[in-house]
């Protein structure tokens, strides 16, 4: 008999579910193609942010000791900041293209713009603009494109708060052209 040196209890259910979703949707494969050296860290941080939505990334060290996750090791808060900063626009667009191609034939794309009010005086994109709530705070606009059936987002863009929805849609159509999408079905709301 071999003596037991260490015992450990780890949570795996949610990670297993996310692993399967990542495989079925192509998210894991597309992340691996676009971020070959860091995709496991990205997945681990995504799992954490979904499961611990109210906790800051500084708590990842504690969480990762109790949960099985793709990276399998700690990602200190400073390293996660560096990881997010290292993501280049070219890589991000490549990921969006890959995800969009998986959805283009199968479903309509839904597009929505939301405003996020802010008191920040240092963020360049925080500007005075119009919003549905009619609050007169500076804001940033977030444009999101997602599969209508799957509900999976595969494109986002942060925009200055003073950019109108019409200009945003024109920019989106230009970006579709750049990404090689010639014929797409997009659902928009009247907002």
Regions found by a protein language model. Give the residues of each.
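Short, basic/hydrophobic alpha-helical segments
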Residues: 98, 166-184
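Acidic, metal-coordinating catalytic cores used for nucleic-acid/nucleotide bond scission
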Residues: 187-191
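Non-catalytic terminal/interface segments that mediate subunit docking, oligomerization
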Residues: 128-133
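Short, flexible loop/turn motifs enriched in small residues
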Residues: 134-140, 149
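Dynamic "connector" segments at or just before major functional cores
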Residues: 1-125, 143-162, 170
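Short secondary-structure boundary/capping elements
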Residues: 136-137, 164-168
């Amino acid at each position: 008999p071999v003596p037991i040196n260490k015992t450990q209890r780890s949570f795996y259910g949610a990670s297993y579910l996310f692993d399967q979703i990542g495989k079925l949707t192509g998210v894991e494969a597309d992340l691996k193609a676009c971020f070959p050296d860091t995709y496991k860290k990205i997945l681990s941080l995504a799992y954490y942010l979904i499961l611990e939505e109210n906790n800051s990334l500084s708590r990842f060290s504690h969480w990762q000791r109790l949960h099985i996750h793709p990276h399998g090791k700690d990602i200190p808060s400073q390293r996660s900041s560096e990881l997010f900063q290292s993501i280049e626009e070219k890589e991000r667009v490549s990921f969006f293209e890959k995800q969009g191609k998986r959805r283009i034939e199968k479903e309509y794309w839904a597009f929505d713009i939301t405003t996020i009010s802010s008191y920040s005086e240092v963020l360049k994109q925080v500007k005075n603009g119009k919003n549905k709530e009619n609050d007169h705070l500076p804001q940033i606009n977030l444009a999101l494109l997602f599969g209508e059936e799957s509900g999976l987002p595969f494109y986002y863009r942060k925009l200055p708060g003073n950019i109108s929805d019409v200009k945003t849609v024109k920019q989106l159509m230009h970006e579709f052209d750049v990404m090689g999408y010639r014929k797409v079905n997009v659902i928009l709301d009247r907002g």
